[in-house]
Design a protein with these regions (language model features):
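Mixed-charge, glycine-accented linear interaction segment located at domain edges/termini
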Residues: 125-179
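Short, acidic/charged, Gly/Pro-enriched secondary-structure junctions
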Residues: 97-124
Length: 179
């Protein structure tokens, strides 16, 4: 790909952080059910009754990272989502187990603090072949009364592209069972 345009800086505010994250099992999306137009995801067809499930985390504890590198002449991006789920109760632990033990992998949608939604765990070239999978699950009680008690989950995948933004599809549409 050649450089074909200038990049001008903008004076508008850009905030860091992630507002929310939701996951769906790989088996709930058919191959070819996602399409991209002009570098943006504009179609995601979910199986009937399926949806992305929101994982509420502590404020300012969700992070999406995208690290690119050139290896042997090939571009590779490592996508990571890290979130902290407060508490070690059964409900939280069951939700974590469902996420990290999904051996076929998951896709995620992440909404950043600027309102842009990204699809993570899918690539136009590889379709559903490189979904997100658990990299780590670190749970603990903390030592003192004011220490964090809960789980830090890291999900990761590799792709030949940066994650695609989603346009024309709302968060509410993706997190409501498909009909």
């Amino acid at each position: 790909m050649a450089i074909t345009a200038n990049l001008a800086s903008t004076c508008s505010a850009i905030s860091g952080g992630v507002r929310r994250v939701a996951f769906i099992s790989l088996g709930d999306i058919a191959e070819g059910a996602i399409s991209v137009t002009s570098g943006e995801v504009d179609t995601i067809t979910l199986a009937t009754g399926k949806e992305f499930f929101s994982y509420d985390a502590e404020q300012d504890t969700i992070e999406w990272r995208e690290n690119g590198e050139m290896v042997n002449g090939s571009l590779k991006y490592t996508e990571e989502i890290e979130l902290y789920i407060r508490g070690n109760n059964k409900t939280n632990r069951d939700a974590i187990v469902a996420l990290v033990e999904d051996l076929c992998g998951v896709l995620a949608i992440v909404e950043d603090s600027n309102g842009t939604i990204f699809l993570i765990g899918w690539s136009e070239d590889l379709d559903l072949d490189r979904p997100l999978k658990m990299a780590s699950d670190a749970s603990g009680s903390g030592k003192e009364l004011t220490d964090l008690a809960g789980s830090t989950i890291t999900m990761t995948c590799m792709s030949p592209h940066k994650a695609f933004p989603i346009t024309g599809i709302t968060w509410a549409t993706l997190t409501t069972p498909a009909s």
